[in-house]
């Protein structure tokens, strides 16, 4: 689960976070 943080909202960084 990717935490709802401003960093994870970035597409590039979000791609490195697990889905959800």
From Swiss-Prot:
Subcellular location per the Swiss-Prot or TrEMBL entry = Secreted
Keyword Secreted found: yes
Q: What is its main location?
A: secreted
| Organism (species) | Anguilla japonica
Q: What does this protein do?
A: Displays antimicrobial activity against the Gram-negative bacterium A.hydrophila.
Which UniProt keyword terms apply here? Answer: Antibiotic, Antimicrobial, Secreted
Provide GO CC annotations from the record: extracellular region
Which protein are we looking at? Antimicrobial peptide AJN-10
Q: Name one GO biological process term.
A: defense response to bacterium
Q: Which domain of life is it from?
A: Eukaryota
């Amino acid at each position: 689960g990717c935490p709802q943080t401003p960093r994870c909202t970035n597409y590039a960084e979000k791609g490195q976070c697990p889905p959800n």
